[in-house]
């Protein structure tokens, strides 16, 4: 009888430890899925030249957008334009305008997408290539910082490299 009560105690302790972990895993998985949906909406909006949808994915009252040349690209630019800057600021609004007005088909393809989140903030990191008129005109790495707002997950900042 003592063995059975000890076994019951061990099982009860195990279940009490596993249940909260599974609930936390489920919440984390739901956040990752929601962020992945933002990634997919971003890609679809570019292809569709849909500036309204694309703009809705960003935190509206905040803007941090940086482009950084990779070494080879930087060396080429510096040779032609000695006063050029390696790191350049822009805005998500300018990107939305570009997407809406591009006369050619455009697409950004993502590879090796990695998402991390604690449910309040998140990050997305991936390799990409950007196509214009069916031809690659940029490739590199990109990262997004994301925040969970009253309206769901939003991109709060973006950093990407420019390469060939």
Regions found by a protein language model. Give the residues of each.
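Short beta-strand edge/turn micro-motifs at domain boundaries
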Residues: 123-125, 137-164
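Short, solvent-exposed secondary-structure junction/capping segments
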Residues: 43-44, 56-76
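Positively charged n-region of N-terminal signal peptides that target proteins for export
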Residues: 1-6
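Short, low-complexity N-terminal intrinsically disordered segments enriched in polar/charged residues
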Residues: 19-60
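Surface-exposed, charged secondary-structure patches
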Residues: 78-136
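Bacterial N-terminal signal peptides
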Residues: 7-17
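A mature extracytoplasmic/lumenal domain signature
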Residues: 58-59, 69-70, 126-130, 159-160
């Amino acid at each position: 009888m003592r063995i059975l009560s000890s076994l019951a105690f061990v099982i009860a302790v195990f279940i009490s430890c596993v249940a909260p972990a599974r609930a936390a895993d489920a919440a984390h998985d739901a956040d990752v899925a929601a962020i992945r949906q933002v990634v997919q909406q971003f890609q679809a909006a570019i292809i569709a030249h849909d500036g309204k949808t694309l703009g809705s994915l960003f935190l509206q009252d905040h803007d941090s957008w940086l482009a950084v040349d990779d070494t080879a690209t930087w060396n080429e630019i510096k040779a032609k334009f000695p006063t050029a800057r390696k790191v350049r600021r822009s805005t998500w609004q300018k990107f939305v305008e570009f997407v809406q007005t591009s006369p050619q088909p455009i697409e950004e393809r993502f590879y090796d997408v990695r998402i991390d989140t604690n449910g309040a903030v998140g990050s997305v990191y991936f390799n990409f290539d950007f196509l214009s008129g069916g031809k690659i005109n940029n490739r590199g790495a990109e990262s997004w910082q994301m925040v969970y707002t009253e309206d769901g997950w939003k991109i709060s900042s973006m950093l990407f490299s420019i390469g060939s």
